[in-house]
Regions:
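Glycine-rich hexapeptide-repeat left-handed beta-helix
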Residues: 98, 103-105, 109-217
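Long, low-complexity, charged/polar intrinsically disordered regions
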Residues: 13-23
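Basic (Lys/Arg-enriched) interaction patch that binds polyanionic ligands
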Residues: 72-112, 131-132
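Single conserved hydrophobic/aromatic residue that forms the stacking wall/gate
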Residues: 1-12
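Glycine-rich adenosyl-nucleotide cofactor-binding module
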Residues: 22-89
Length: 217
């Protein structure tokens, strides 16, 4: 691991080892300088090495080297894309894309939403989200999703979540584990307002992102 640092003046304007940090901080203080530590990490910011075309990144420190951002992707301040993760574009990313996760074109991750990767409890399951999906604010998924899927705000779907499948008339069809629905398209995950039971309905209305969010004029 290494430390990215910047001191006032010409001292410590370099990358130092973690083991050097305590002494470097002490030396800076004795000289009346401020040593600012930006990160202690194995992965630097992606934009220090690669700047993709046609993207907007509100906070460059949230995109680690090894991430992929496709043309038309916007990553807002609280969005995060880990290494070996990808937003194929165009996408609006206000949530977290974990290591190994790929989201398809036109998919929107709402504020503080997340995807469960192999580094965050997902085991060996590779999570992907298809095209024109919406993961609402504070929601998330631990199963792969096909195209045109929606998870309502605040609902986190894990592989073992009990889900009641209902038809277009609202009639209950069967109860399954969420893993049994992995990879399917046109699913709408919501909670029953009275019981809190997780329901899966057919989602025939594709989510369209606001074109203005992806304008680079």
């Amino acid at each position: 691991d290494s430390v990215k640092s910047r001191g006032l003046g010409d001292v410590y304007k370099r990358q130092i080892e973690v083991t050097e940090l305590p002494q470097a901080l002490l030396n800076a203080r004795t000289q009346g300088l401020n040593l600012e530590v930006f990160s202690i990490d194995k992965f630097p910011k992606m934009v220090n090495y690669v700047v993709p075309n046609g993207v907007r990144i509100a906070d460059a420190s949230r995109i680690r080297l090894g991430a992929y951002l496709g043309d038309g992707t916007t990553v807002m301040h609280e969005g995060f894309v880990n290494f070996n993760a990808a937003a194929l574009g165009p996408n609006m990313v206000e949530g977290r894309i974990s290591q190994g996760v790929i989201i398809g074109a036109g998919t929107d991750l709402g504020g503080s939403s997340s995807t469960q990767g192999t580094l965050s409890g997902g085991g060996e399951i590779v999570i992907s989200i298809g095209e024109q999906c919406l993961v609402g604010a504070n929601a998330g998924t631990g199963i792969p999703l096909g195209d045109r899927c929606t998870i309502e705000a605040g609902l986190y779907i894990t592989a073992g979540t009990p889900v009641m499948v209902v038809d277009e008339t609202g009639t209950q069809v069967r109860q399954v584990k969420a893993r049994d629905l992995a990879g399917q398209s046109d699913m709408l995950f919501i909670r029953d307002a009275k019981t809190g039971q997780v329901l899966c309905k057919t989602n025939r209305k594709a989510i369209e992102l606001n074109d203005a969010l992806h304008s680079h004029n």
